């Protein structure tokens, strides 16, 4: 079963959301009469201001699979709070054997991330970040690990509320 790793494609629709296709795999189902070929697509959608969604779709043809994945990504969007185009703090995300470390970076650093993580940060609107991935490099697992880490991130006001202090006390 051949695996097709598609180049990351970007598209912007009339709704203002940024779309990127991360991968397209050729999949087969073996039945009594032979093999049934299909395609599985993995995509991310973001608004450039901290909202991000991931979707996967399967179909007999590539365009249909990609469209299904884009629709699912639009439905499953989550909000991540950013700070001046970077992350709030260092965070680690895990999914299966994939582990990703994401660190905020100062202005001018750029997006230092590989493969699927780069696509996520570009559609999300992050302009300065440093990342490192450990373990599995499977695109699906890396995307899920990245989203796990981003959802773990908390703002200074959330931390202050948990501790019962003011934001100024937290930021020092």
From Swiss-Prot:
Domain S5 DRBM: 17-80
Keywords of this entry: Ribonucleoprotein, Ribosomal protein, RNA-binding, rRNA-binding
The keyword Manganese is assigned to this record: no
An example molecular function term from Gene Ontology annotations: rRNA binding
Coiled-coil region list: none
Gene Ontology biological process terms in this record: translation
Record-linked Pfam families: Ribosomal_S5, Ribosomal_S5_C
GO cellular component, one term: small ribosomal subunit
SUPFAM superfamilies given in the database record: dsRNA-binding domain-like, Ribosomal protein S5 domain 2-like
Record keyword Hydrolase present: no
Subunit structure: Part of the 30S ribosomal subunit. Contacts proteins S4 and S8.
Record's comment describing the protein's domains: The N-terminal domain interacts with the head of the 30S subunit; the C-terminal domain interacts with the body and contacts protein S4. The interaction surface between S4 and S5 is involved in control of translational fidelity.
Task of the protein: With S4 and S12 plays an important role in translational accuracy.
Family: Belongs to the universal ribosomal protein uS5 family.
Name the UniProt record assigns to this protein: Small ribosomal subunit protein uS5
Annotated organism of origin: Cupriavidus pinatubonensis (strain JMP 134 / LMG 1197) (Cupriavidus necator (strain JMP 134))
